[in-house]
Amino acid sequence: MPHYLVELYTPNATWQALPESQRTTFLAGIRTAMSGLAQMGIEVLALGDTDYSVDQASAHRFLGIWRFPTPQARDILLAGIKASGWYDYFDHVNAASNTGGLESHLATLARQ
């Protein structure tokens, strides 16, 4: 059963204060670290700017959507993100879930 992660993030003042050369070096490290993720079955479904024109839009500037074969694979990615120092530079929230269908989701909502 696939598992999913949605990230929402915005560069913070610490990131904005870095010279471009340091930002580039940091992002090169991220690129290198991400190169082996596909071998673990980790898929990037989307990385990009958020669309502020949608109803109830998030104030976050960027989003990432990921699919994982197991929760353990998801946790490997999250541990790598944390270890990289990413959270020092970006205001960031994560939302994770496994696969679910409409009927089970509606039943869960009804019980809340």
Regions found by a protein language model. Give the residues of each.
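Short S/T/G/P-rich N-terminal loop/turn motif that feeds into the first structured element of a domain
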Residues: 1-60, 68-74, 98-112
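Charged, amphipathic alpha-helical segments and their flanking helix caps
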Residues: 17, 84-86
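Conserved, mostly hydrophobic/aromatic
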Residues: 64
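Short amphipathic alpha-helices in soluble, non-transmembrane regions
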Residues: 75-84
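Conserved short beta-strand edge segments in small beta-sheet-based binding/regulatory domains
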Residues: 86-99
